[in-house]
Design a protein with these regions (language model features):
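Class I SAM-dependent methyltransferase SAM-binding "motif I" and its flanking Rossmann-like core
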Residues: 16, 92-165
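A contiguous loop/helix-start segment that scaffolds small-molecule binding in enzyme catalytic cores
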Residues: 4-9, 70, 80-85, 139-141, ...
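Proteins with a high burden of low-complexity, intrinsically disordered sequence enriched in S/T/G/P/A and R
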Residues: 20-25, 30, 136, 160, ...
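Class I S-adenosyl-L-methionine
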Residues: 1-17, 22-116, 124
Length: 173
């Protein structure tokens, strides 16, 4: 691994800059390079230094102008420069954010990275409207599932397990 961590996979949370972690806010402001998704709110992008290099890699349903392998290559290329690089992702990088794929690609290329968690969309939305994801006596757990998988694979969900009345079910895009 290279000496110091200069690549950070940062969760931007649900869009409100006040809901960023202190570390996420600091890294976004200090970053020399910001590689960001379409789901990152414009209010959060305003925190990025005007001197930073910004690279948009946003994806939409069935439209990926920058495929994941190219995003991985970008991260590795910027890691090689030694510049402080933030990979800014909506929500949390490890909740359907492909952060684990990006971290693995960096590590396989010999670069360490640090994960900075963010508030997930499910957490932010439930808190905003006052409906808890768990509640003693009602919901003893939370289950996150995706409604989509890789295009070459069928969606294979445990429908019976998902019907557990004691578990809150959160379905992501």
């Amino acid at each position: 691994m290279h000496a110091a961590t200069r690549v950070f996979l940062v969760g931007a949370g649900p869009g409100d800059p006040d809901l960023l972690t202190v570390k996420a806010s600091r890294l976004i402001r200090e970053a020399e390079v910001v590689i960001y998704d379409r789901l990152v709110a414009p209010e959060i992008m305003k925190l990025v230094s005007p001197h930073a290099t910004r690279v948009a890699v946003g994806k939409e349903s069935k439209r990926h102008p920058v495929p994941q392998h190219k995003i991985n290559e970008l991260l590795i290329d910027f890691a090689r420069t030694g510049r402080l690089t933030v990979r800014l992702k909506g929500g949390d990088p490890f909740i359907f954010g492909r952060g684990s794929e990006e971290a693995l690609a960096l590590r396989q290329a010999g670069f360490d990275c640090e994960i900075v968690p963010g508030i997930t969309a499910a957490q932010g939305c439930s808190a905003r409207i006052g409906i808890p994801l768990t509640h003693r006596g009602l919901a003893t757990g939370v289950r996150y599932v995706t409604g989509h998988c890789r295009q070459d694979l069928p969606l294979d969900l445990d429908w019976q397990g998902l019907a557990d009345s004691q578990t809150t079910l959160v379905v992501y895009m």
